[in-house]
Amino acid sequence: MNKVILYCRPGFEKECAAEITDKAARYNVYGFVRVKDNSGYVVFECYQHEDADRLIKELPFQELVFARQMMVCGELLRDLPPEDRITPIVGMLTGVLERAGELRVEVPDTNESKELMKFCRKFTVPLRAALRENRILLAQEKASRPVIHVLFIAPGCCYVGYSYSNNNSPFYMGIPRLKFPADAPSRSTLKLEEAFHVFVPADEWDERLGSGMFAVDLGACPGGWTYQLVKRSMMVHAVDNGMMAPSLMDTGQVIHHQADGFRFEPPRNNIYWLVCDMVEKPAKVTNRMADWLVNGWCREVIFNLKLPMKKRYEEVTQNLALLAQRLEENGINFEIHAKHLYHDREEITVHARRIWGAIPGRRDER
């Protein structure tokens, strides 16, 4: 198996291809990319046979911005016989994988492929049984073992492969299944909820998303992102010249500042989270987020960058480099991650965290 498949949002195949080519080269892995517009996936074919497995082990999945999932696979299985689709799939995995912990029969995130979803659900049951019988799949799901992926791109045509559970997306099709809350002021609320799932490990939610924290939401109206903070029992400074949803103001947890989000400064030095979903040039937003982190006005930020129509990958890399440069110049320890979330459209979501600790010449404890 010498191919790496990456799932992505339809329409962003070129950005996904540019990113995997760039980042694979950093690990001395070289190959070529097969891209089909609006297909929802990209195939990176490695020149060296063993490089595909090495790449999905060594390239941290969380460093990929445009990929929803990353797996190794072999050649496309075409024209699977309707009377026996299982045998070729089992044959593809025999001798390659043993004792996998989970099976996912998936499709790309396109309207055409979604017509195959019903078939995939039904097909999973007999395929799972056959894989267990051949000892390719464990009798019980095990989160620490590799995941088998069967990606149907058309009726009777699929890629078969695997990912490592410690370096993949834990979600089916790479998409968190979130339900829109009926009382939320706008659908944008799902962007921040998804960001929390992607950027903050579940076992750290109590510490980093706990009740009683203070947060700032720049460009808050009508309150989609503020809603997520309020739901987690935080106190929120909502900054926007527009009006906030009365339902949020009635909670008593929101202070509304009718001000410019790019000029607002926190009234007290007790802010943990800064979130921002303002429509503005990416560099302007990035610099303002850097200001907050450099000045110690917050510990963690989540913000959106609206992308141009062309050279979107270049725009992303430039802004992430700008943010890192600003923090490095000020001697700050930090983590930065970015993702093109399922609920993002022509934008990406960035998370940056200031690592507070003992730095010579500074007092970083609070």
From Swiss-Prot:
Q: What EC class is this? A: transferase
Q: Classify the main location.
A: cytoplasm
Q: Which family does it belong to?
A: Belongs to the class I-like SAM-binding methyltransferase superfamily. RNA methyltransferase RlmE family. RlmM subfamily.
Cross-referenced HAMAP family = 23SrRNA_methyltr_M
Name of this protein: Ribosomal RNA large subunit methyltransferase M
Q: Which UniProt keywords apply?
A: Cytoplasm, Methyltransferase, rRNA processing, S-adenosyl-L-methionine, Transferase
Active site annotation, chain numbering: K306
Assembly, per entry: Monomer.
Q: Which GO terms describe its cellular component?
A: cytoplasm
Name the GO terms of the biological process aspect: methylation; rRNA processing
NCBIfam families recorded: PRK11760.1
Residues binding S-adenosyl-L-methionine, per UniProt: S188, C221, P222, G223, G224, D240, D260, D277
Against InterPro entries, the record matches this protein to: RlmM_FDX, RlmM_THUMP-like, RNA_MeTrfase_FtsJ_dom, rRNA_MeTrfase_M, SAM-dependent_MTases_sf
Keyword Transferase included in the entry's annotation: yes
| Molecular functions per Gene Ontology | S-adenosylmethionine-dependent methyltransferase activity
Function text: Catalyzes the 2'-O-methylation at nucleotide C2498 in 23S rRNA.
Q: Report which reactions are catalysed by this protein.
A: cytidine(2498) in 23S rRNA + S-adenosyl-L-methionine = 2'-O-methylcytidine(2498) in 23S rRNA + S-adenosyl-L-homocysteine + H(+)
User: Which Pfam family, any one, appears in the UniProt record?
Assistant: RlmM_FDX
The enzyme's E.C. designation: 2.1.1.186
Compartments reported by the entry: Cytoplasm
